[in-house]
Amino acid sequence: CLGIGSCNDFAGCGYAVVCFW
């Protein structure tokens, strides 16, 4: 799962793997 564009939950993973502010 990737959290690109967000540091919040992405795709229901419960965490963001990659965060871009």
Swiss-Prot record:
Disulfide bonds join C1-C13, C7-C19. There is a cross-link at C1-D9 (3-cysteinyl-aspartic acid (Cys-Asp)). The keyword Disulfide bond applies. Keywords: Disulfide bond, Thioether bond. The keyword Disulfide bond applies. Active against HIV-1 virus in vitro. This is Tricyclic peptide RP 71955. It comes from Streptomyces sp. (strain SP9440).
